[in-house]
């Protein structure tokens, strides 16, 4: 049976959800449509009982944009979609982060959500529709799921908030924020803004949440009509005697350890020792208490002998101890108060050959950030369903295993690295100079050397500092901070600059980046229900104070961008040439432009309008390239003196001289010197660079070719060496 539900969200935005037509063998499948953009989402969850040793939810979310959806061919030799693009990975992460908290605690069945974009009108982006479709697919399935979830994008054009703005509307929007949530609460945020205030952000979130409520209700109605019963699920129940024993065995030790302000490695070692000792004692205790007959009569008692289950119980007490310490005493694992930011150190120019660099250290989190400046040719070509463009500002984030003291594989860039890099990039992009002001392609690379929380925000701070060190004229400096939340009933505490443990054991990870004038990017993940706007307002205000503190430290290190680019950065010079001369500069098969590059070391880029951009790390190379190009397009004029190169010597005739690139003229034997010349080779040889004057231009009546008559005698100077042929002419 095909069931379709439709809703009008206002502003001409109509969304429909359909189930029962496609992918009927999946546990759940829906098609969501807005305009002519359509996505199909499917979900399948394994019915195989997971191992009792499993302690994570193996949820896989895949988002794919099919090129046929927009009537396009994929690029590359094979002409088919291959590995996911960065856009697809980021969209999948958005959906995953919103869905994951809504599955029941302890549900560890392998689950796969696949979202395919099957039609694109190239105006309505499909990413947030994918989140809606995924939630709806789970709702109409038999898979346990707490609440319907919906995702929307909020923009603002001319002061008016818009739900799911089109690509054209986003061009004029000062907000681009994706929001995921249920009818009761927000569980995910991510977006970029043009320095908006905290109050404006809250207004945008509230506006988006109203649309989310309507979409969640639509899903509930759809699921009600499908009326598919949820499969039975009972989470693993830990025996009460095990919980009691573990509490008595380790709670006091964990509490004592929590109140010690220790370094990350020391704390990890001492925590590991408590775990090992408690597991050993518990197994000894229950092995003696339970004989074979008791285990046979009650198989659940075997859980008391399971090392993994015991460690999970210890972990729950460790989590509770840390949370109560924060809520009751306002103290944190490293001894800070709730709002205190860890010590910050900054070093600039640490990589001599980079075009800008910084080493940013905050507590036990450290980022080494380098900047590379390039030309338009270095821009990244990005092709998506909705547009094709050259990306000239990028930030890449690397998180090697040694940064957390581990051994690991070094493979392709992971989803987490792509997501963190994108957030840092969006944070800084808003203050980057425009192409007219700064026509460089900019690549920032953040190498995380140490990590104990908030490495993406360290990348924002380090990236800003590296750009300023490199002389990139940022509009304003940007800093970022990660906020945390501990909530128990009505009690809550907001934490500034969270540690890795506080992120892991807490209820929220809220990253905020911005300038002194407003927020430029944010990302939030919530692990609990019931986050109200009052808490969010407090978190934003506290984040603002933290950002300003970090900005103070950054401005102490470097108050403004350096006035000069780095020594090894390319210098860009732009000149305008006639459009009809472009082919002359490029040459046959690019021969001429390649020879200029080889000769001068400069990189040359030519636009269709005749703008020639020359990039070279030395002023000499730039000057030489400009002179060659000007000489190339120069029209020979009688009476003008040129610096040319002898190409051929004919003893009884004269010398052929290349006086402008690719153009030769003849210095007749009688025009070489005021003295009588009997043998040209006595005076000139191939390769000599000489000054000549153009004395005549005439057409050969037999061939129709233009002949150029040159004179050394008219210049009245001896041959000179060291000046390239084709230098800019000297007017007589």
UniProtKB/Swiss-Prot annotation:
PROSITE patterns: KH_TYPE_1 (PS50084), S1 (PS50126). This is Polyribonucleotide nucleotidyltransferase. Belongs to the polyribonucleotide nucleotidyltransferase family. SMART domains: KH, S1. It holds the Pfam family RNase_PH_C. The gene is pnp. Keywords: Cytoplasm, Magnesium, Metal-binding, Nucleotidyltransferase, RNA-binding, Transferase. The keyword Cytoplasm applies. Involved in mRNA degradation. Catalyzes the phosphorolysis of single-stranded polyribonucleotides processively in the 3'- to 5'-direction. Disulfide bonds: none annotated. CDD domains: KH-I_PNPase, RNase_PH_PNPase_1, RNase_PH_PNPase_2. Its main location: cytoplasm. Mg(2+) binds at residues 503, 509. The keyword Chloroplast does not apply. It catalyses: RNA(n+1) + phosphate = RNA(n) + a ribonucleoside 5'-diphosphate. Residues 639-713 form the S1 motif domain. One of its GO terms (biological process) is RNA processing. It is found in: Cytoplasm. The lineage of its organism: Bacteria, Pseudomonadati, Chlorobiota, Chlorobiia, Chlorobiales. Residues 570-629 form the KH domain. InterPro entries: ExoRNase_PH_dom1, ExoRNase_PH_dom2, ExoRNase_PH_dom2_sf, KH_dom, KH_dom_type_1, KH_dom_type_1_sf, NA-bd_OB-fold, PNPase. HAMAP family: PNPase (MF_01595). It comes from Chlorobium luteolum (strain DSM 273 / BCRC 81028 / 2530) (Pelodictyon luteolum). One of its GO terms (cellular component) is cytosol. GO terms for molecular function: 3'-5'-RNA exonuclease activity; magnesium ion binding; polyribonucleotide nucleotidyltransferase activity; RNA binding. Its EC number is 2.7.7.8. Its cofactor is Mg(2+).
């Amino acid at each position: 049976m095909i069931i379709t539900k439709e809703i009008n969200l206002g502003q001409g935005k109509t969304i429909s959800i359909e189930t029962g037509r496609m992918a009927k063998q999946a546990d759940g499948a829906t098609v969501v449509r807005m305009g002519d953009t359509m996505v199909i989402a499917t979900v399948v969850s394994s019915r195989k009982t997971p191992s009792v040793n499993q302690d994570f939810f193996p949820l896989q979310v895949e988002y794919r944009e099919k090129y046929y959806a927009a009537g396009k061919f994929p690029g590359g030799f094979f002409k088919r979609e291959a590995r996911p693009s960065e856009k697809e990975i980021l969209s999948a992460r958005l959906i995953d982060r919103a869905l994951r908290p809504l599955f029941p605690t302890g549900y560890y069945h392998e689950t796969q959500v696949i979202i395919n974009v099957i039609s694109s009108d190239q105006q309505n982006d499909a990413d947030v529709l994918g989140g809606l479709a995924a939630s709806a697919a789970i709702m109409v399935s038999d898979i346990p799921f707490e609440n319907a979830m919906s995702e929307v994008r909020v923009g603002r054009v001319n002061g008016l908030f818009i739900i799911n703005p089109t690509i054209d509307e986003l061009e004029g929007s000062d907000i681009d924020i994706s929001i995921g949530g249920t009818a009761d609460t927000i569980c995910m945020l991510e977006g970029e803004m043009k320095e908006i205030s905290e109050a404006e952000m809250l207004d945008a979130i509230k506006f988006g949440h109203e649309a989310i409520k309507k979409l969640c209700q639509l899903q509930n109605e759809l699921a009600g009509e499908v009326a598919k019963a949820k499969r039975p699920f009972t989470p693993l129940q830990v025996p009460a005697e095990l919980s009691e024993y573990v509490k008595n065995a380790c709670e006091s030790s964990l509490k004592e350890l929590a109140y010690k302000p220790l370094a990350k490695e020391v704390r990890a070692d001492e925590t590991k020792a408590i775990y090992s000792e408690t597991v050993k004692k518990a197994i000894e205790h229950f092995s003696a208490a339970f004989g074979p007959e008791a285990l046979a009569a009650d198989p659940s008692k075997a859980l008391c002998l399971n090392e993994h289950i015991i460690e999970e119980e210890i972990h729950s007490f460790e989590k509770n101890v840390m949370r109560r310490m924060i809520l009751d005493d306002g103290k944190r694992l490293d001894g800070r108060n709730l709002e205190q930011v860890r010590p910050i150190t900054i070093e600039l120019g640490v990589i001599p050959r980079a075009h800008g660099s910084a080493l940013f250290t905050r507590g036990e989190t450290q980022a080494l950030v380098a900047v590379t400046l390039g030309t338009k040719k270095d821009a990244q070509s990005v092709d998506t369903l909705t547009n094709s463009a050259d990306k000239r500002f990028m930030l890449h984030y690397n998180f090697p295993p040694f940064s957390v003291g581990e051994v690991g594989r070094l493979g392709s860039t992971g989803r987490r690295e792509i997501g963190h890099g994108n957030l840092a990039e969006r944070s800084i992009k808003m203050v980057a100079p425009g192409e007219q002001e700064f026509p460089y392609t900019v690549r920032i690379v953040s190498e995380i050397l140490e990590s104990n929380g908030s490495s993406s925000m360290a990348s924002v701070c380090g990236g800003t500092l590296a750009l300023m060190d490199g002389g990139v004229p940022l509009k304003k400096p940007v800093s970022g901070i990660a906020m945390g939340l501990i909530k128990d009933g009505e009690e809550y505490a907001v934490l500034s600059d969270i540690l890795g443990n506080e992120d892991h054991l807490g209820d929220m990870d809220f990253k905020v980046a911005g300038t002194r004038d407003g927020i430029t990017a944010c990302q939030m993940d919530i692990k609990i229900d019931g986050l109200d706007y009052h808490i969010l307002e407090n978190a934003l205000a506290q984040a603002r104070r933290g950002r300003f503190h970090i900005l103070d430290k950054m401005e102490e290190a470097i108050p403004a961008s350096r006035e000069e680019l780095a020594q090894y950065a390319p210098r860009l010079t732009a000149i305008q040439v006639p459009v009809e001369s472009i082919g002359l500069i490029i040459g046959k098969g690019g021969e001429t432009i390649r020879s200029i590059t080889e000769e001068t070391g400069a990189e040359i880029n030519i636009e269709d309008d005749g703008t020639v951009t020359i990039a070279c790390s030395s002023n000499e190379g730039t000057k030489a390239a400009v002179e060659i190009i000007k000489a190339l397009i120069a029209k020979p004029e009688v009476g003008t003196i040129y610096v040319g190169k002898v190409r051929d010597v004919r003893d009884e005739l004269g010398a052929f001289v290349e006086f402008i690139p690719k153009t030769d003229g003849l210095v007749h034997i009688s025009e070489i010197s005021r003295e009588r010349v009997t043998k040209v080779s006595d005076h000139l040889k191939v390769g000599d660079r000489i000054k000549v004057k153009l004395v005549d231009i005439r057409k050969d009546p037999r061939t129709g070719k233009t002949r150029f008559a040159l004179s050394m005698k008219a210049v009245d100077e001896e041959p000179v060496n060291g000046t390239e042929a084709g230098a800019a002419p000297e007017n007589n």
